[in-house]
Amino acid sequence: MHVVYPGSFDPLTNGHLDVIQRASRLFEKVTVAVLENPSKRGQYLFSAEERLAIIREATAHLANVEAATFSGLLVDFVRRVGAQAIVKGLRAVSDYEYELQMAHLNRQLYPGLETLFILAATRYSFVSSTMVKEIARYGGDVSKLVPPATLRALKAKLGQ
């Protein structure tokens, strides 16, 4: 089965990478879909191309993982790449409530499309891209929260 794992990934965290690695063991092919939201231009720390490069570097050891950018409806991207399902990581109940609504909406737009949830590993359940950016902006150590590719990109971007 071919699945899509969508997100902003601004930046990629160890939590994201854990979901990608686990999905790669469960599914034949995983496409990491990097959202490029035109209405949020200027709000991202990293451009879509930079996020894509970070993901590709961090997942280079996973032969069945690819990454691509998309804008517009996720269901259109899923159709375009020929995937059968969406994979989402869940950290907390609040994630579940939001993702459940999105799963129902996506299924309404694309009947038969499945959304599969992977629970975050406990050690990453508190990690978010927003928190990583905030800590990094203030010079805090995020090395245990992000893969080496992200750490290098953060240091370069923030001049550290």
Swiss-Prot record:
Pathway of action: Cofactor biosynthesis; coenzyme A biosynthesis; CoA from (R)-pantothenate: step 4/5
Binding positions (ATP): S8, F9, H16, G89, L90, R91, E99, Y124, S125, F126, V127, S128, S129, T130
Molecular function GO terms recorded: ATP binding; pantetheine-phosphate adenylyltransferase activity
Co-factor requirement: Mg(2+)
Pfam families attached to this UniProt entry: CTP_transf_like
Protein family per UniProt: Belongs to the bacterial CoaD family.
Protein name: Phosphopantetheine adenylyltransferase
Species of provenance: Thermus thermophilus (strain ATCC 27634 / DSM 579 / HB8)
High-level lineage: Bacteria, Thermotogati, Deinococcota, Deinococci, Thermales
Gene name of this polypeptide: coaD
